[in-house]
Amino acid sequence: MTTFYTVISWLSVFGYWLLIAGVTLRILMKRRAVPSAMAWLLIIYILPLVGIIAYLSFGELHLGKRRAERAKAMWPSTARWLSELKECQHIFANSNSEVASPLFQLCERRQGINGVKGNQLQLLTTTDDTLKALVRDIELARHNIEMVFYIWQPGGLVDQVAESLMAAARRGVHCRLLLDSAGSKQFFRSPYPAMMRNAGIEVVEALKVNVFRMFLRRMDLRQHRKIVLIDNYVAYTGSMNMVDPRFFKQDAGVGQWIDMMARMEGPVATTLGIVYACDWEIETGKRILPPPPDANIMPFEEETGHTIQVIASGPGFPEEMIHQALLTAVYAAREQLIMTTPYFVPSDDLLHAICTAAQRGVDVSIIVPRENDSMMVRWASRAFFTELLNAGVKIYQFEGGLLHSKSVLVDGQLSLVGTVNLDMRSLWLNFEITLVIDDDGFGADLAQVQDDYIARSALLDGERWNKRPLWHRVTERLFYFFSPLL
């Protein structure tokens, strides 16, 4: 009996180290950033069982077998649709400004289509303006409404949006609503899903959270896009979730959330539509490609208006696309670079690009919230401040609430707005959407908004920053080490 237990003990020890060795080898063989690999190895060797379970759950990008098969199956039809779209040459921009050309060329070669022109574009900077405009557009809808959001939380003006959406469905408008399971958990626990389905709205819970399937699909992979499409002509996207900030996270101690949205009319609605169609097919298996380009786009033909490129990122879309786009935009800057983000945990490449821009004479400003709803991100982001300050980057800490807007403005001409945070989750993991706008008029509008943010912010003083307590420095470095996992 003693021999039996001895054998079992040795087999357990052997299996234990074999499992650690196997996971270690898998991490080393995967093509990933060195800081990320080192962080995972540290966790596994300090807390082996916890680390292995965490890595198998969150360490690799598992879309899930069923969704991966759908993503693979949809591309032939999507490619044909894009080929038909490219025949409508009148909607595509033939040239771009000097600062925007590299980024638009990158997008065209990686995504297959160029930016579209002739769009009307309005920047909305308050929740009230956005939700009221959205209600008006829903009330005017005649054919179809598609929406995707990370968070939909009932309450306040959001309930007016829900009521107008149900009224539209009852009068015959085809309505689809795609909401992230984790972000919109309060919505799915409310009476609204049943009410909306009874009204005729297709409501889909995206990327359902199921602990029993945690090893089959990465649970923290989230649908982070915010898109509204109405009659294939009007579109919205930006940083705002479907929430009324007067009722959202009031106990978080960070103040009201500050967002911006873009309202568009024109052919960009069609390019956003193909992104929505892909998301819908990946989640439901149903194909809903936008109407044929000729029927849908001809009314949009205009010589004036904004030129916009759409960047869709996430599993099943061109790899590293948004990361490459941000790097290209930063390196294109010659005079000024302004970035706003609620979560600043950049990759090493992006950090170095920003610092290099400042060191070659570009006026670089980063606007982040002073208070953050994520304690881990708050400390991790502070670990980058010293390097940024030493390079000459100006860091503004917004004091008027949780600044949730995501924007980049390059030389007053090239603008990027959308859902992407400057952190690892947005850059490498989540489903995100970004608008790239080549227009100095829109750039002036965005600059005005950013100037307002700066006026409500405090400039971080380098000398005072260097005198912060030792325990702050230690905490920052601790969270910095795990920043590749945030």
UniProtKB/Swiss-Prot annotation:
Belongs to the phospholipase D family. Cardiolipin synthase subfamily. ClsA sub-subfamily. The active site is at H224, K226, D231, H404, K406, D411. HAMAP family: Cardiolipin_synth_ClsA. One of its GO terms (molecular function) is cardiolipin synthase activity. SUPFAM superfamilies: Phospholipase D/nuclease. Pfam families: PLDc_2, PLDc_N. The chain crosses the membrane at residues 3-23, 38-58. This is Cardiolipin synthase A. Keywords: Cell inner membrane, Cell membrane, Lipid biosynthesis, Lipid metabolism, Membrane, Phospholipid biosynthesis, Phospholipid metabolism, Repeat, Transferase, Transmembrane, Transmembrane helix. It is an enzyme of class 2 (transferase). Catalyzes the reversible phosphatidyl group transfer from one phosphatidylglycerol molecule to another to form cardiolipin (CL) (diphosphatidylglycerol) and glycerol. GO terms for biological process: cardiolipin biosynthetic process. The keyword Lipid metabolism applies. The gene is clsA. The keyword Cell membrane applies. It is a multi-pass membrane protein. PANTHER family: CARDIOLIPIN SYNTHASE (PTHR21248), PHOSPHOLIPASE D (PTHR21248:SF22).
